[in-house]
């Protein structure tokens, strides 16, 4: 009689996004910080965290590359963290994404992922400037796109990681000098050391509620 054993398979979580996620997979990035949290909670053997971020990406870029960069890797869960460039690039280069197109592409991505029985988590874009009095030039647009993502999450029954609201709440007390950068970001957008730790904990907390056991 052949003897066998069951080898435990790690559950794979892919983080799908832009330059923030690309950096998140590097040293000190939020994905690496989450690896550390998993190790500290004796769960590292059960989960594989994979970064799939590309600088400059917008929602339609994710849609175009999701087959190769996500579906082909057979993840158990996907965390989508996108939206800053869809807003930011409207102002800087005129190549942002209109709200209706943003919503349509986002829904199409979720549909494809759910067809494969992949758990989908949505993140709101965190910041384009850290000022707390809503004088960052793109606060209005960013809040609008965050609201769209909240609606998409509710409509599709996807867990929401509301980084936009979390950043606003934290910065009220941590950025009393009303600086446009330096508390959680290096430049108002990309995460510094504190920002990577902050995002890692928020994502871990959300995943622990329904996916990480």
Report each predicted region and the residues it spans.
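Serine-esterase "nucleophile elbow" of acetyl-processing enzymes
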Residues: 1-55, 60, 65-74
């Amino acid at each position: 009689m052949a003897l066998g054993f069951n080898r435990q398979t790690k559950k794979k979580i892919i983080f799908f996004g832009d330059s923030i996620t690309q950096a998140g997979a590097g040293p000190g990035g939020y994905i690496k910080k989450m690896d550390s949290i998993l190790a500290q909670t004796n769960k590292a053997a059960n989960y594989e965290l994979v970064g799939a971020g590309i600088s400059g990406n917008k929602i339609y870029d994710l849609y175009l590359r999701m087959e190769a960069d996500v579906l082909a890797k057979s993840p158990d869960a996907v965390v989508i963290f996108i939206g800053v460039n869809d807003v930011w690039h409207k102002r800087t280069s005129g190549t942002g994404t209109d709200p209706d197109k943003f919503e349509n592409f986002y829904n199409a991505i979720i549909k494809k992922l759910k067809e494969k029985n992949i758990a989908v988590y949505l993140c709101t874009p965190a910041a384009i400037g850290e000022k707390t009095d809503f004088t960052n030039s793109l606060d209005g647009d960013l809040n609008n796109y965050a609201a769209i993502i909240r609606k998409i999450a509710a409509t599709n029954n996807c867990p929401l990681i509301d980084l936009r609201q979390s950043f606003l709440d934290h910065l009220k007390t941590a950025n009393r000098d009303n600086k446009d950068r330096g508390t959680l970001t290096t430049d108002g957008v990309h995460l510094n050391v504190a920002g990577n730790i902050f995002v890692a904990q928020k994502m871990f907390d959300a995943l622990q509620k329904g996916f990480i056991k």
